């Protein structure tokens, strides 16, 4: 399975970079992992709704340009479906079973994902009704993917 995480913005915090590197290394035993970063847009302090939509659209165009046409796309969005770790593991296993060898998780910038990205997504996933920093979301997602592989293989880790 080839799993990509397409995200807006570069990681800046050393602890996040170290965490992403650690889970990417751990996951290499289970799948090919790729992190795709696209440039984020500066959001003016008092941006209008129109300006925010235009920013999301520009970031979305960059994301869409990096997504293979044959990939199964999972958008991380607050309005997505929430799953337990076990349900998430079962979903990844199901995708692999049905030949979805390319899975792309998409993480938007601070304003979220554009309508175009959401339209391209095959499904939307939410980790919580709470809002998380988009940079931290990468690390949380990688940990849950790692946990899912461990669950699916019956390996110790998940408690």
Curated annotation (Swiss-Prot):
S-adenosyl-L-methionine binds at residues 76, 108, 127-132. It comes from the Bacteria. One of its GO terms (molecular function) is rRNA (pseudouridine-N3-)-methyltransferase activity. Keywords: Cytoplasm, Methyltransferase, rRNA processing, S-adenosyl-L-methionine, Transferase. It catalyses: pseudouridine(1915) in 23S rRNA + S-adenosyl-L-methionine = N(3)-methylpseudouridine(1915) in 23S rRNA + S-adenosyl-L-homocysteine + H(+). One of its GO terms (cellular component) is cytoplasm. It is an enzyme of class 2 (transferase). Its main location: cytoplasm. Pfam families: SPOUT_MTase. The keyword Transferase applies. Its EC number is 2.1.1.177. It is found in: Cytoplasm. Specifically methylates the pseudouridine at position 1915 (m3Psi1915) in 23S rRNA. Belongs to the RNA methyltransferase RlmH family. Homodimer. This is Ribosomal RNA large subunit methyltransferase H. It comes from Geobacillus thermodenitrificans (strain NG80-2).
């Amino acid at each position: 399975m080839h799993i990509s995480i397409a995200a807006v913005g570069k990681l800046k915090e050393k602890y996040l970079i170290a965490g992403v590197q650690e889970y990417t290394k751990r996951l290499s035993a289970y799948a090919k992992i790729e992190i795709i970063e696209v440039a984020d847009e500066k959001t003016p302090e008092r941006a209008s709704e129109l300006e925010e939509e235009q920013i999301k659209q520009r970031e979305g165009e960059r994301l869409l340009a990096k997504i293979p046409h044959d990939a199964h796309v999972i958008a991380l969005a607050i309005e997505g479906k929430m799953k337990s770790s076990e349900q998430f593991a079962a979903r990844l296993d199901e995708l692999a079973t049905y030949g979805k060898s390319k899975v792309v998780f998409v993480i938007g910038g601070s304003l979220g994902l554009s309508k175009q990205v959401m339209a391209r997504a095959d499904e939307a996933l939410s980790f919580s009704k709470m809002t998380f920093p988009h940079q931290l979301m990468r690390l949380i997602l990688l940990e849950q993917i790692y946990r899912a592989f461990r669950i699916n293989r019956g390996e110790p880790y998940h408690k």
